């Protein structure tokens, strides 16, 4: 029997992931990152977001073979501030950093999966070939394979170099680099540049929008969308109701 795939977009302290995984613990579950730094207007405190991340880590430990945890720009900002300081919890930076470092072996930057005859690439924001070429000092662009990013990330010395490239931010997000990194790419970068990695369907989050999944040419799927999580009208803003994509 084929497993279901459950993809959890940007959490930011929301609780919708709990309903999504309940009863599906043996299915394939992939979190797209950004667990911390909640939106103030949603009524979620940094403390609540920290607790959700603790529980997500515990969920991963209970189901290590089925659950993949990817990191987003907000999470990585606690490991390297040059990557992101947006909405960062200044008071608890050291605590958040320690939680991530203590469990760093549980996290990846990218995940490559086979589904039928297709190869699907999961990441926080999507992978552009322009970003790879811009960082050819780090990546073997002629023989690149996505798993190379994780290999560098899990090497303590290599991680320092990777963090330099992960801090790349394009003009679409207020930066000056030719391309956003795999944790910073805005979906409009794909729309205007048509430089996604060939041979893959990519599924990512990062670019928040209302409605359902944002699909480009059937092979780029942005899931950081309003239909994935919706505040219950009768509850306070920390109560989240899971919706089907």
Feature map (PLM): residue ranges:
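Active-site-proximal loop/helix segment associated with metal-binding centers of metalloenzymes
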Residues: 90-95, 114-195
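Active-site environment of divalent metal-dependent phosphoester hydrolases
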Residues: 13-16, 37-39, 74-80, 128-130, ...
């Amino acid at each position: 029997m084929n497993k279901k795939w459950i993809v959890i977009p940007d959490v930011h302290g929301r609780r919708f992931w709990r309903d999504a995984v309940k009863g599906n613990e043996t299915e394939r579950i992939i979190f797209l990152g950004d667990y911390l730094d909640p939106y103030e207007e949603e009524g979620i405190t940094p403390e609540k977001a920290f607790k959700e991340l603790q529980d997500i880590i515990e969920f991963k430990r209970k189901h290590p073979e089925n659950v993949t945890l990817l990191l987003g720009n907000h999470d990585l900002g606690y490991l390297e501030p040059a990557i992101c300081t947006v909405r960062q919890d200044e008071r608890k930076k050291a605590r958040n950093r320690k939680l991530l470092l203590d469990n760093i072996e549980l996290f990846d930057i990218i995940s490559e999966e086979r589904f039928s005859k297709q190869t699907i690439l999961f990441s926080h924001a999507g992978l552009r070939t322009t970003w790879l070429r811009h960082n050819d000092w780090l990546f073997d662009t002629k023989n690149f394979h996505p798993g190379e990013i994780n290999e560098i990330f899990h090497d303590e010395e290599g991680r320092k170099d990777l963090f330099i490239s992960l801090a790349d931010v394009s003009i679409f997000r207020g930066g000056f680099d030719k391309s956003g990194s795999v944790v910073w790419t805005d979906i409009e970068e794909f729309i205007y540049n048509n430089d996604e990695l060939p041979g893959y369907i990519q599924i990512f989050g990062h670019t928040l929008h209302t409605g359902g999944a944002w699909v480009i040419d059937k092979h780029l799927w942005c899931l950081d969308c309003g239909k994935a999580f919706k505040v219950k009208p009768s509850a306070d803003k920390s109560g989240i109701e899971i919706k089907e994509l």
